[in-house]
Regions:
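G-domain G4 guanine-recognition motif of GTPases
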Residues: 74-76, 101-115, 134-141, 157
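Conserved Switch II/interswitch segment of TRAFAC-class P-loop GTPases
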Residues: 67-86, 112
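Phosphate-binding loop that captures ATP/GTP phosphates
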Residues: 1-16, 121, 133
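Conserved C-terminal guanine-recognition region of P-loop GTPase G domains, centered on the G4
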Residues: 81-100
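Beta-strand-loop-alpha "switch" segments that mediate conformational coupling across diverse proteins
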Residues: 107, 123-152, 165
Length: 183
């Protein structure tokens, strides 16, 4: 009940545990704290989505181990490619479950951008990863939706990014249903 009380509800369908208003050190919480929060959230909700900081903390391992799937967002630039390869090497060196990572390209090329698609393919091959998901650029629509505190599905229901997120959500829901049936 304490966790749900700390969350901000949206139309009683979505509950969000927002980031603290003050900047706090990443080592303020421990891996066991994170694990307990995830367990409580799993008992309360059908799906738990965690947005992690850009830097790895001691408790990042707990999130990776407790997650069913871990999306690593990247963009089509050299810095993101270097960070992806660093992440891959770090996880493999520590024997962490790298196979849980699903790489998602943010601001992916448009449907007709063949040059962009070939760059994505070359990037994936050179990094030795699969880019499982390509999210289109949401542009101002996403910014405006976030500024108004509204989900993209309500403020911009026909946006291409919203449709891709919906496809992803449906596929994750199917995986969840199949896992529940198997158990």
């Amino acid at each position: 009940d304490a966790l749900v009380g700390a969350m901000v509800p949206f139309e009683e369908k979505l509950h969000v545990l927002t980031a603290p208003s003050d900047i706090i050190p990443l080592d303020l919480i421990t891996s066991s704290d994170v694990h307990r929060i995830i367990e409580v959230a799993r008992r309360q909700f059908d799906y738990v989505v965690i947005e992690t900081p850009k830097t790895l903390a001691q408790w990042s391992e707990a999130i990776l181990n407790d997650s069913h799937v871990y999306f690593a967002l990247l963009e089509l630039d050299m810095r993101c490619a270097q960070n992806a390869i660093r992440l891959k090497r770090a996880l493999q060196a520590e024997d962490l479950p790298f196979e849980k990572l699903r790489f998602a390209l943010n601001r992916g090329p448009r449907f007709t951008d063949l040059n962009g698609k070939s760059r994505v393919k070359r990037m994936a091959e050179s990094l030795g990863i699969a880019i499982d998901l390509q999210l289109p650029d949401g542009g101002r629509q996403v910014t405006q939706s976030a500024d108004h505190g509204q989900p993209l599905a309500i403020s911009q229901p026909k946006a291409p990014l919203r449709r891709e997120i919906q496809k992803l959500a449906l596929s994750l829901h199917e995986i969840g249903q199949n896992s529940a049936v198997a158990a």
